[in-house]
């Protein structure tokens, strides 16, 4: 045929736009498409693209553009080419005009098209210019435009060249070829990147992100990240290998934007009080707010991040448009395969279109995912920063309602859950759109039979929602049990010394395993429901297809089930199934996110510190006054009653004011009121000048000594040295391995209690403040150290002389040195004046002193006189004492966040020398997970269950393959009179295979989850047992945070993540085998292409897994630092505010978050790199399957072709998820490595021994004998105690004293076998303690430590952990310690729930409760290890009186700093350098005038 039948001549218009050129059966190259259609598409599509998107793009770069670019060579070439194109199209427009002028008739389009292109090219050239001015270095818009300009016109040009029309219109064709060449050149240039901006706003980072230097194709496919992935494959990645963070991703930028919007929205709330949020005083209100405060936060998030979210949503919508183009193209392709007379080029074209549609879907979907993941990263940073800034302004009442662990949980769980929900926001509306489009497709394919799909779908939807709701209930129950387990575990680890000292491990393990059992029960139920849900999702495609096919076969007139109807229906139903699956899941995730969002909003609305609570202004004070309180009434929160009433106080410049009073009088509250920490009900507070604060419980940071002291101030070495010497830290620091640069560990793990307190004091002194507020800083110090510190720092001649000082103290002998004394009682000022004035008044102060003078029992006269002298005599007895350096704790590693109280992680290792101190760091695994880890997990699952699971997966996948193959046979059945003969049989077998697949799928899913629960149970028990059986030295060396990670985060991964990743991997791996088998069986030729594709997949997988595993581990470690810093700041927020250090602390938090983002960003880019490239290769497999089907059309049925191509369409996601699942599983398997870290650590001696059971009443008398006893705390350290040989008689009361580092506490550790003897031994009632199990030994000895310890739970549980006493006995013990009235006043009385570790009680009250607990144990041996050091003299007298009555017949070992405490002991042991230097009664030792006498002199007792 002639070409004129298919081509329009240049002068004629196109009458129709039929796509297919049907004039010839086998057309030549230039007959492929109708020329008129190509002309219309080529003429209008590129201009429409640019004119629609161009103005929007101009507006965007106008708002978001940066500095202009240099006029580079690349820009000049682009502009020259642009002007050349303008000239050519001007010429093309001028030619028709010239011809019209000459009278030649011309078609309208010959003038319209060049004119449109002329204006469009002018606009494109203008965009090139504007991009340079706005700093755009690689344009995606123009890349797409030049690409469109090349594709369709190129086909048109090829057709014209093939038609041989060059000779007819040579000039026109030359212009066309030249234009095409210039457009191709522009396309090539648009793939290049221009030079950086001429003037950059920021200095160039050391390792900039290569995205800025990437071309548009590289950005689209994330090839710019390949360098980092290749580097991670070749070596271990370090911080220097990661890209620098862009400013738009920095914490400072993100948090400031969100905080500004949030505060603006919050201020618009009705009832807003200005400085403070809505009060939520109870922890329950924090966890489950009664009324939502989400509005301001939600609006703030939307205003800050809406542009990123909306751009991502646009990409998703475009991606879904191409998603739904694939079924239509598949329908056309199967129609082509079923028509034996159709032309081959139709199949080729459809294969190319399916490939392009799939590629465009991949491109836009990955761009959506990239934008959403970046949005998630930014939102996590912004909200975490907002929470951190809120922590810095929380009021004291708000802090009491939440613990550090709650805040960390808020950031690590709730924030994460919130940001993950962003991915599901579009699911609320877009999935419904999917469903509508799917039903439209089904109606077109099957007609009214598609209505049955609607019915089945609607019947399954409530089932899925019901399952999701039930599963959500059990998940919430699991979360509650997990939270309970986490709190109990945290308490156990932070109080492990107390637990081990009392032999309570079994009780706590039993309690913990009970909670764990309930948690696993909820987990199993949730997993069972999840299995049902997964099966319903997977089988819903089959159910809908079965019903639709059955109805269509029975009802429809044209009821033949051909390949197009069968496999296009299945393809559409697979999309519908995704919608059905993700819709309930999206709703569930959003519901969970709403709960988390409410918690976050409630926390952000908690009451803040009143900025007007304390005025730093001299206007309210006279010129000589520094502090003034006028008619002050203060409360801890809006709901609590006032704790201070009618306070009127004026403190002049340079005054030392001592504040005293009984326990609970309000002494610490007064300091908090001065700091503005309490809610000011009425009155005014004014302070002139800067303030420094020393808390009662020392708070130190996990940094070096010098950084703790300087506390974000400039280093002044002479002043630093002077401060350290005055605070009695000079000799200590000199003994440290790195001097002032020695890390102190988290919460000062590497320091003794006294060192931490003096470090806290040094921090305040270094400040050079005008006003000093000190909350009993001398309580934790030895007598001689206390004297030295008071004289050199606080006293009249100390470093702080001339400053205004308020000293809360229980050390009454310093009162004569104070300028003024304030006595508080019941929250009011009882009296105030000088020491002599108050003595003459004979008022409240005299009552306190008289109480301190009262002896606890009958003692020696000299001891009583000495006690009186100690209380009232001041420092009359001695000059400046000679001090030895107090030796730090023996830990090699620092722990992480924890309470500063608790002897637990703080052995008073006053006797241990430290050879090296380093901050503890958690172990980080490198490289691939070892096969032994997988084997250990599989052994925990069980070999039979593993084998059974694989068999079930194989069976259900075989059923799935047979189901698809059987459908292809059904589709190929011959049609006779519009009907197929065996439809009933085909349908029945199809349904049977589907049922078998459903059963196998449910069984396999359930087997995976049950196996995971079994493995999790065994691994947790193993971890718990390994940790509980570890000696105390293990806890001193291992940070608490590391252990908590094992019991919380790592255990959660083993519980949930590993079974889920294992299920996903097995599902997709077996599905991949099915796809490969289907494609290979239908078109064996495809194997030739599949093998290279699989090699490329393996290469991508290797690069990704090697890098991603490292990035995830680094990210986890960096995020732990963020959480640790957050917890540390929460615990010390009062100090931070007092020192006005919020700015530096915020900057440190931002730096830690930025470092975390430097790792998070490459990881999310690596995920997109993998997905984009694997989907691109998967799309190639679709193309291979389609082209092979076209090549094999002569002998390939339409049914098999549909089976092959429809399976190949699923392989894109399948192959990606195989790699992703394997990577996720390997990352999750790191948790198994970590929970097994402590399997091979040394363990304690057995808790129970058979020999112990034979002596149930041991010990009867309580005689203790040391025989040449010695111990060291670690093999590399010197002996802490050596050569101790002595006998303590039954019922004897022995005091143990000595300087710091003398070995006092080490004796008690040896007695309790917290440290095993290195030499010699200890006998109790003639029985070696090594013959007794540890629990038998420790349960027969009672110890009251210096720092009182309470546990989460009821007051009764704390008093009687083993439930061995009646309520009457407990009340009797409480009455003995004079706490019965206090406990009676509590809500619930004995069932009163203690907050945290008794944070809602004073130190004195907690110590008395610990004493009551000791009374209830009824043991023959009692150890008091500095038990009265932190309490006031009145409380100490109460304790001594109770001990005298209850333990009169028991052997008592009393370790004391205050020599007054041991003056009425029958015998005193004086320890020195690990040996017993002196032994005898107090009177005898004083008469000897030896070491005890010198200690008494330093304490003012001699």
Swiss-Prot record:
Protein name: ATP-binding cassette sub-family C member 6
Domain ABC transmembrane type-1: from-to ranges: 309-592, 946-1227
E.C. numbers: 7.6.2.-, 7.6.2.3
Membrane topology annotation: Multi-pass membrane protein
UniProt-listed GO biological process terms: ATP metabolic process; ATP transport; calcium ion homeostasis; gene expression; inhibition of non-skeletal tissue mineralization; inorganic diphosphate transport; intracellular phosphate ion homeostasis; leukotriene transport
Catalytic activity annotation: an S-substituted glutathione(in) + ATP + H2O = an S-substituted glutathione(out) + ADP + phosphate + H(+); leukotriene C4(in) + ATP + H2O = leukotriene C4(out) + ADP + phosphate + H(+)
GO molecular function: ABC-type glutathione S-conjugate transporter activity; ABC-type xenobiotic transporter activity; ATP binding; ATP hydrolysis activity; ATPase-coupled transmembrane transporter activity; inorganic diphosphate transmembrane transporter activity
Family recorded in the similarity comment: Belongs to the ABC transporter superfamily. ABCC family. Conjugate transporter (TC 3.A.1.208) subfamily.
Side Extracellular, residues: 5-37, 100-104, 156-173, 322-347, 446-448, 553-574, 960-996, 1082, 1196-1197
Transmembrane segments: 38-58, 79-99, 105-125, 138-155, 174-194, 301-321, 348-368, 425-445, 449-469, 532-552, 575-595, 939-959, 997-1017, 1061-1081, 1083-1103, 1175-1195, 1198-1218
Keyword Cell cycle: no
InterPro entries: AAA+_ATPase, ABC1_TM_dom, ABC1_TM_sf, ABC_transporter-like_ATP-bd, ABC_transporter-like_CS, ABC_transporter_C-like, MRP, P-loop_NTPase
Species this chain originates from: Rattus norvegicus (Rat)
Glycosylated residues in this chain: 21
Description of post-translational modifications: Glycosylated.
Residue ranges annotated for the ABC transporter domain, each copy included: 627-851, 1264-1498
Location(s) in or outside the cell: Basolateral cell membrane; Cell membrane; Lateral cell membrane; Basal cell membrane
Region: Disordered, residue numbers: 854-909
Binding site for ATP 1: 661-668
Any Pfam family matching the protein: ABC_tran
Residue positions, PTM Phosphoserine: 891, 1285
Major subcellular site: membrane
Tagged with keyword Phosphoprotein: yes
């Amino acid at each position: 045929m002639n070409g004129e039948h298919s081509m329009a001549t240049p002068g004629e218009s196109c009458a129709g736009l039929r796509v297919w050129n049907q004039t010839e059966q086998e057309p030549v190259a230039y007959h492929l498409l109708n020329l008129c259609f190509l002309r219309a598409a080529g003429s209008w599509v590129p201009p429409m693209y640019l004119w629609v998107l161009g103005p929007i793009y101009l507006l965007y770069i106008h708002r978001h553009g940066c500095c202009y670019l240099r006029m580079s060579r690349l820009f000049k070439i682009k502009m020259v080419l642009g002007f050349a194109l303008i000239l050519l199209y001007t010429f093309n427009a001028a030619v028709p005009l010239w011809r019209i002028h000459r009278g030649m008739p011309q078609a309208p389009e010959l003038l319209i098209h060049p004119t449109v292109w002329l204006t469009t090219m002018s606009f494109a050239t203008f965009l090139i210019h504007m991009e340079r001015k706005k700093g755009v270095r690689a344009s995606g818009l123009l890349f797409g435009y030049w690409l469109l300009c090349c594709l369709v016109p190129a086909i048109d040009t090829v057709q014209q060249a093939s038609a041989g029309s060059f000779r007819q219109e040579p000039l026109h064709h030359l212009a066309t070829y030249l234009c095409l060449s210039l457009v191709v050149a522009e396309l090539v240039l648009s793939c290049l990147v221009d030079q950086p901006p001429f003037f950059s706003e920021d200095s160039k980072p050391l390792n900039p992100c290569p995205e800025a230097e990437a071309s548009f194709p590289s950005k689209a496919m994330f090839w710019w990240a390949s360098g980092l992935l290749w580097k991670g494959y070749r070596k271990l990645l370090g911080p220097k290998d990661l890209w620098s963070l862009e400013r738009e991703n920095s914490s400072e930028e993100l948090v400031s934007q969100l905080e500004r919007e949030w505060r603006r929205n919050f201020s618009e709330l009705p009832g807003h009080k200005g400085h403070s949020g809505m009060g939520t005083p109870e922890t329950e209100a924090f966890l489950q707010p009664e009324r939502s405060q989400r509005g301001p936060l939600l609006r703030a998030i939307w205003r800050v991040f809406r542009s990123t979210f909306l751009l991502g949503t646009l990409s998703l919508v475009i991606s879904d448009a191409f998603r739904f183009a694939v079924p239509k193209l598949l329908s056309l392709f199967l129609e082509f395969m079923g028509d034996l007379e159709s032309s081959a080029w139709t199949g080729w074209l459809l294969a190319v279109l399916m490939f392009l549609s799939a590629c465009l879907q991949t491109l836009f979907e990955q761009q959506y995912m990239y934008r959403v993941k970046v949005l998630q990263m930014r939102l996590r940073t912004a909200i975490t920063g907002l929470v951190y800034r809120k922590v810095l302004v929380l009021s004291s009442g708000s802090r009491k309602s939440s613990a550090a662990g709650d805040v960390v949980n808020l950031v690590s769980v709730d924030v994460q859950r919130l940001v993950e929900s962003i991915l599901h926001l579009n699911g609320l509306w877009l999935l419904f759109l999917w469903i509508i489009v799917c039903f439209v497709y089904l109606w077109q394919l099957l007609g009214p039979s598609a209505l049955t799909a609607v019915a089945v779908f609607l019947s399954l939807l409530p089932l899925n929602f019901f399952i999701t709701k039930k599963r959500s209930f059990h998940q919430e129950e699991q979360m509650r049990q997990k939270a309970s387990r986490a709190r109990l575990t945290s308490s156990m680890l932070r109080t492990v010394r107390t637990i081990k000292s009392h032999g309570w491990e079994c009780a706590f393990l039993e309690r913990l395993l009970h909670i764990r059992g309930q948690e696993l029960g909820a987990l199993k139920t949730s997993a069972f429901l999840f299995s049902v849900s997964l099966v319903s999702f997977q089988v819903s495609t089959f159910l809908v297809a079965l019903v639709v096919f059955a109805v269509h076969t029975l009802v429809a007139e044209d009821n033949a089930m051909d390949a197009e109807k069968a496999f296009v229906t299945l393809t559409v139903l697979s999309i519908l199934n995704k919608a059905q699956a993700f819709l309930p899941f999206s709703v569930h995730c959003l519901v969970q996110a709403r709960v988390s969002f409410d918690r976050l909003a409630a926390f952000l609305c908690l009451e803040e510190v009143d900025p007007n609570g304390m005025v730093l202004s001299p206007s309210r004070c006279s010129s000589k006054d520094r502090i003034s309180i006028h008619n002050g009434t203060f409360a801890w929160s809006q709901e609590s009653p006032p704790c201070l009433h009618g306070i009127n106080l004026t403190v002049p410049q340079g005054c030392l004011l001592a504040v005293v009073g009984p326990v609970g009088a309000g002494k610490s509250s007064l300091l908090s009121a001065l700091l503005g920490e309490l809610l000011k009900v009425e009155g005014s507070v004014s302070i002139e000048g800067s303030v420094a604060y020393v808390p009662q419980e020392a708070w130190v940071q996990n940094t070096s000594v010098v950084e703790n002291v300087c506390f974000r101030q400039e280093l002044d070495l002479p002043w630093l040295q002077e401060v350290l010497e005055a605070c009695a830290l000079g000799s200590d620091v000199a003994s440290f391995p790195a001097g002032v640069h020695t890390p102190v560990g988290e919460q000062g793990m590497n320091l003794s209690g006294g060192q931490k307190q003096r470090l806290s004091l040094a921090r305040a002194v270094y400040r050079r403040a005008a006003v000093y507020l000190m909350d009993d800083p001398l309580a934790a110090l030895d007598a001689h150290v206390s004297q030295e510190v008071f004289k050199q720092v606080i006293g009249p001649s100390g470093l702080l002389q001339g400053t205004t000082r308020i000293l809360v103290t229980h050390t009454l002998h310093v009162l004569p040195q104070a300028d003024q004394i304030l006595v508080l009682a019941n929250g009011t000022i009882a009296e105030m004046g000088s020491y002599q004035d108050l003595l003459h008044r004979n008022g409240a102060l005299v009552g306190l002193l008289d109480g301190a003078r009262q002896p606890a029992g009958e003692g020696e006269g000299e001891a009583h006189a000495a006690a009186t002298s100690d209380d009232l005599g001041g420092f009359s007895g001695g000059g400046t004492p000679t001090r030895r350096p107090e030796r730090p704790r023996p830990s090699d590693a620092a722990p992480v966040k924890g309470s500063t109280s608790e002897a637990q992680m703080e052995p008073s290792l006053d006797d241990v020398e430290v050879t090296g101190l380093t901050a503890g760091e958690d172990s980080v695994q490198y490289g691939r997970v070892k096969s032994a880890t997988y084997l250990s997990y599989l052994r925990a699952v069980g070999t039979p269950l593993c084998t059974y699971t694989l068999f079930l997966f194989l069976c259900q996948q075989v059923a799935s393959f047979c189901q698809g193959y059987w459908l292809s046979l059904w589709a190929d059945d011959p049609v006779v009179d519009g009907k197929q003969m065996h439809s009933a049989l085909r349908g029945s077998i199809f349904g049977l295979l589907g049922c078998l697949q459903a059963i196998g799928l449910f069984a396999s899913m359930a087997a995976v989850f049950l196996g995971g629960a079994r493995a999790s149970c065994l691994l947790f028990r193993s971890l718990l047992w390994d940790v509980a059986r570890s000696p105390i030295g293990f806890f001193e060396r291992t940070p608490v945070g590391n252990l908590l990670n094992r019991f919380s985060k790592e255990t959660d991964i083993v519980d949930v993540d590993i079974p889920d990743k294992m299920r996903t991997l097995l599902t997709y791996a077996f599905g991949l085998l099915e796809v490969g088998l289907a494609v290979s069986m239908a078109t064996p030729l495809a194997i030739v292409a599949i093998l290279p594709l699989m090699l490329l997949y393996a290469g991508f997988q290797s690069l990704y897994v090697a890098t991603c595993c490292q990035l995830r581990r680094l990210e986890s470690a960096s995020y732990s630092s963020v959480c640790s810093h957050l917890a540390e700041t929460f615990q010390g927020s009062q100090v931070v505010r007092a020192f006005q250090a919020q700015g530096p602390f915020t900057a440190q938090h931002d730096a830690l978050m930025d470092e975390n983002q430097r790792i998070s960003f490459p990881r999310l880019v690596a995920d997109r790199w993998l997905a984009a490239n694997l989907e691109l290769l998967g799309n190639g497999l679709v193309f291979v399957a389609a082209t092979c089907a076209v090549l094999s059309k002569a002998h390939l049925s339409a049914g098999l072709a549909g089976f092959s191509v429809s399976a190949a369409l699923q392989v894109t996601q399948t192959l990606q998820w195989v790699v992703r699942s394997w990577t996720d599983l390997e990352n999750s398997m790191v948790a198994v490595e970590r929970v097994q870290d402590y399997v091979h650590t040394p363990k304690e001696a057995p808790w129970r021994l058979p020999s112990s059971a034979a002596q149930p009443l041991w010990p009867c008398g309580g005689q203790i004998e040391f025989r040449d006893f010695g111990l060291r705390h670690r093999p590399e350290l010197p002996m802490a105690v050596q050569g101790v040989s002595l006998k303590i008689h039954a019922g004897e009361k022995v005091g143990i004293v000595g300087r710091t580092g003398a070995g006092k506490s080490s004796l008690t550790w040896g007695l309790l076998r917290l440290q095993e003897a290195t030499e010699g031994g200890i006998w109790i009632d003639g029985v070696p303690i090594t013959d007794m199990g540890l629990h038998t030994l420790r349960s027969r000895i009672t110890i009251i430590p210096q720092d009182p310890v309470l546990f989460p739970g009821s007051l009764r549980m704390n008093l009687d952990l083993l439930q061995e006493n009646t309520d009457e006995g407990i009340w009797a013990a409480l009455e003995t310690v004079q706490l019965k009235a206090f406990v009676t006043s509590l809500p619930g009385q004995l069932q009163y729930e203690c907050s945290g570790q008794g944070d809602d009680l004073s130190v004195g009250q907690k110590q008395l409760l610990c004493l009551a607990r000791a009374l209830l144990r009824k043991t023959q041996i009692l150890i008091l290890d500095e038990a009265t050091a932190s309490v006031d003299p009145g409380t100490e007298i109460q304790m001594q009186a109770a001990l005298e009555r209850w333990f009169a017949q028991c052997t008592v070992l009393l370790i004391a700093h205050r020599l007054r405490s041991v003056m009425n002991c029958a015998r005193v042991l004086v320890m020195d350098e690990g040996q017993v230097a002196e032994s005898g009664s107090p009177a005898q030792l004083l008469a000897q005038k030896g070491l005890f006498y010198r200690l008494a002199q330093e304490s003012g007792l001699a």
